[in-house]
Design a protein with these regions (language model features):
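Conserved ABC ATPase signature
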Residues: 51-55, 59
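Hydrophobic anchor residue at the start of the ABC signature
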Residues: 65, 93
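ABC-type ATPase nucleotide-binding domains, specifically the catalytic core motifs of the NBD
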Residues: 5, 12-30, 42
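Conserved ABC ATPase "signature" region
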Residues: 31-46
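A short, proline-enriched helix->beta-strand linker immediately N-terminal to the Walker B motif
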Residues: 70-74
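A short, surface-exposed alpha-helical micro-motif characterized by mixed small hydrophobic
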Residues: 118-120
Length: 150
């Protein structure tokens, strides 16, 4: 997630990128699952014929999210999910991730240096410094801005 430009093989179509994990696991209805995953992240099914260089950064991030959802995880690690994106695309991706979390009843483990991203995405947070947890925050504390390191 951290770098959508490096996360996708440049010589593979999106179809190959998305279908491959399903084939490895012996899943059925691969075409339907790929189509559903793309639609869930706001991309048309015909995008599966494209290569990564034909997509914007936000579209690439959506493909990476779709790939993660294909295997129906209960827990998803989001490592700086918007760090390589401009501000308007960041908001779109964060809102999409929140929507998908609710729809799929997933838990996210979010890693971010951005206090606003943490507040927008989290019910609980832990502040780490020098490799150790320094403090925990709940939703109320984050709404009051107590999670900031200013």
């Amino acid at each position: 997630f951290q770098d959508p430009y490096a996360s996708l093989h440049p010589n593979h179509t999106l179809w190959r990128t998305l279908a491959e994990p399903l084939k490895i696991r012996g899943e059925r209805e691969i075409e339907k699952r790929v189509q559903t995953a793309l639609e869930q992240v706001g991309l048309p099914f015909d995008a599966a014929r494209r290569y990564p260089h034909q997509l914007s950064g936000g579209q690439r991030q959506r493909v990476v999210i779709a790939r993660a959802l294909l295997l129906r995880p209960q827990l998803l690690l989001l490592d700086e999910p918007t760090s390589a994106l401009d501000m308007s695309v960041q908001a779109e991706i964060l809102n999409l991730l929140n929507q998908l979390k609710l729809e799929h009843q997933m838990t996210y483990l979010l890693v971010s240096h951005d206090a606003d991203v943490i507040a927008h995405m989290s019910d609980r947070a832990a502040l780490m410094s020098e490799g150790k947890i320094q403090r925990f925050f709940d939703r109320d504390a984050m709404e009051k801005g107590e999670h900031r390191m200013d």
